[in-house]
Design a protein with these regions (language model features):
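Local sequence-structure signature of Cys/Sec-based thiol-disulfide redox active-site neighborhoods
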Residues: 2-29
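Generic recognition of short, well-ordered alpha-helical segments
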Residues: 21-25, 51-55, 72
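Short helix-capping segments at alpha-helix termini
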Residues: 31-35
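Thiol-based oxidoreductase modules, predominantly thioredoxin-like and allied folds used
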Residues: 36-47
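Short Fe-S-cluster ligation motifs
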Residues: 45-59
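A short, hydrophobic beta-strand/beta-hairpin element that forms part of a small beta-sheet core
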Residues: 58-66
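Non-catalytic, surface beta->alpha helical segment in thiol-disulfide oxidoreductase systems
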Residues: 65-87
Length: 87
């Protein structure tokens, strides 16, 4: 039986993005009850990241896989964050 590890969550955002602020609040709320590692990446000023993510913000990736764009549903995110991966 394998051990479990915490999910790694990345939030790609930009300054002044109201949807990004909403996503940040959802992640913070779920993180209080379900621990996961959160990395916030501001795409501003990085041409490669802007080209890749600008049209989709906010973008949430879980363990390197795109899970949400535009809107983060709290219940759906909670389910994904709670389903542990085998290490």
């Amino acid at each position: 039986m394998g051990s479990t590890r915490r999910r790694s969550v990345s939030l790609y955002h930009a300054s002044g993005c109201h949807l990004c602020e909403s996503a940040r609040r959802v992640l913070a709320s779920v993180q209080r009850e379900t621990p996961f590692d959160l990395r916030e990446i501001d795409i501003g000023g990085d041409r490669e990241l802007e080209a890749r993510y600008r049209e989709w913000l906010p973008v949430v990736e879980i363990d390197g896989e795109r899970a949400f764009v535009y809107y983060v549903d709290p219940d759906a995110f909670r389910r994904k964050a709670q389903s542990q991966s085998s290490a």
